Amino acid sequence: MPKSPSKSSPRKGSPRKGSPRKGSPKRGGKGAKRAGKGGRRNVVKRRRRRRESYGIYIYKVLKQVHPDTGISSRGMSVMNSFVNDVFERIAGEASRLTSANRRSTISSREIQTAVRLLLPGELAKHAVSEGTKAVTKYTTARR
């Protein structure tokens, strides 16, 4: 839920304390003309919504594997769609496993089983070992 701008905090486009309002006439000729235009006072620009993406992480992995290789924006878009698709598949399968076992929380065990079910052979083995390594690293860093 977005916060409404408060009167005490100056924002871009809103008047500050002590300064004349945008629509009020000033001593110059421009201010008097602005007062004549109706409904254009206190125009606050809408902030652009940030688009979430795995782009920075994909780029970091690319540089680890091939330091001298770049990626186009179209290629990044394809990779981002791929990661989102795999994420949704794993989350969906883990959710089904959780409900089948009459539990309410998805644990690392369900994620691991979902990965084994979804990915073929050697790819599943590598994914499980990397996931286990990541969870171990996370739990040791928390202590």
From Swiss-Prot:
Segments for region (Disordered): 1-49
Subcellular location(s) of the protein: Nucleus; Chromosome
Keyword tags: Chromosome, DNA-binding, Glycoprotein, Isopeptide bond, Nucleosome core, Nucleus, Phosphoprotein, Ubl conjugation
SPKK motif 2 (motif): residue ranges: 9-12
Amino acid composition bias (Basic residues), ranges on this chain: 9-49
InterPro entries linked to this entry: Histone-fold (IPR009072), Histone_H2A/H2B/H3 (IPR007125), Histone_H2B (IPR000558), HISTONE_H2B_site (IPR055333)
Gene Ontology CC: nucleosome; nucleus
Sites where a glycan is attached: 129
Ion transport is among the record's keywords: no
Cross-link (Glycyl lysine isopeptide (Lys-Gly) (interchain with G-Cter in ubiquitin)): 137
Motif (SPKK motif 1): 4-7
Pfam families documented for this protein: Histone
Molecular function as annotated in GO: DNA binding; protein heterodimerization activity; structural constituent of chromatin
Annotated positions of the Phosphoserine modification: 14, 19, 24
SUPFAM superfamilies attached to this UniProt entry: Histone-fold (SSF47113)
Motif SPKK motif 5 boundaries: 24-27
Principal location: nucleus
PTM annotation: Monoubiquitination of Lys-137 gives a specific tag for epigenetic transcriptional activation and is also prerequisite for histone H3 'Lys-4' and 'Lys-79' methylation. Phosphorylated on SPKK motifs 3, 4 and 5; which may regulate DNA binding. Dephosphorylated during maturation of spermatids to mature sperm and rephosphorylated at fertilization.
UniProt motif (SPKK motif 3) ranges: 14-17
Motif SPKK motif 4 per UniProt: ranges: 19-22
Domain remark from Swiss-Prot or TrEMBL: Contains 5 SPKK motifs which may interact with the minor groove of A/T-rich DNA sites. Phosphorylation of this motif may regulate DNA binding. This motif is reiterated in both termini of histone H1 and in the C-terminus of plant H2A, but its presence in the N-terminus seems to be unique to sea urchin histones H2B.
Family statement: Belongs to the histone H2B family.
Subunit (UniProt): The nucleosome is a histone octamer containing two molecules each of H2A, H2B, H3 and H4 assembled in one H3-H4 heterotetramer and two H2A-H2B heterodimers. The octamer wraps approximately 147 bp of DNA.
Function of the molecule: Core component of nucleosome. Nucleosomes wrap and compact DNA into chromatin, limiting DNA accessibility to the cellular machineries which require DNA as a template. Histones thereby play a central role in transcription regulation, DNA repair, DNA replication and chromosomal stability. DNA accessibility is regulated via a complex set of post-translational modifications of histones, also called histone code, and nucleosome remodeling.
The protein, known as: Histone H2B.2, sperm
Protein species of origin: Psammechinus miliaris (Green sea urchin)
